[in-house]
A protein has these predicted regions:
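Cell-envelope and extracellular/periplasmic
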Residues: 4-16, 78-89, 100-119
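Active-site metal-binding loops of divalent metal-dependent hydrolases
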Residues: 42-43, 81
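Short helix-loop-beta-strand segments that form the rim/entrance of peptidase-like active sites
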Residues: 70-80
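Structural cue for short, hydrophobic secondary-structure segments
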Residues: 39-40, 108
């Protein structure tokens, strides 16, 4: 079975946004405040193929925050669930991520969202 992963930029959602909230979060960390990092996604976020749980990308990003901002009280939420799509992520984001009021959130559903009309919308 061959899968086509050629995605044109005009078919996707590209939002460069602004860096205001990220800068605010980093300033909070620089000042030694509490920073909650949260990660929502599928098995890549969960770390299912990592050699151990501390080698998954989410934990490595969390460790980066702790290293760059040693005065901050950085906490870690990994809401990665293998085999799930962004549609399921939307259904669980409130309970698994937002209720903790995170300062920094990364979302990844790269593998499980299919290249079909539903996920292109």
């Amino acid at each position: 079975m061959s899968m086509d992963y050629n995605i044109k930029a005009e078919d996707g959602v590209i939002n460069k946004g602004n860096l205001y909230r990220l800068k605010k979060c980093m300033k909070k960390a620089l000042n030694g405040g509490p920073v909650i990092t949260a990660f929502l996604g599928g098995s890549i976020t969960q770390g299912s193929l990592a050699s151990d749980s501390e080698k998954c990308y989410a934990y490595l990003v969390y460790k980066w925050w702790k290293k760059k901002f040693p005065a901050a009280d950085v906490s870690f939420i990994n809401a990665g669930v293998g085999g799930t799509t962004s549609q399921y992520g939307v259904a669980r984001v409130e309970d698994h991520v937002l209720r903790y009021r995170p300062d920094f959130v990364l979302t990844e559903f790269a593998v499980n969202d299919k290249n079909d009309e539903f996920f292109k919308k």
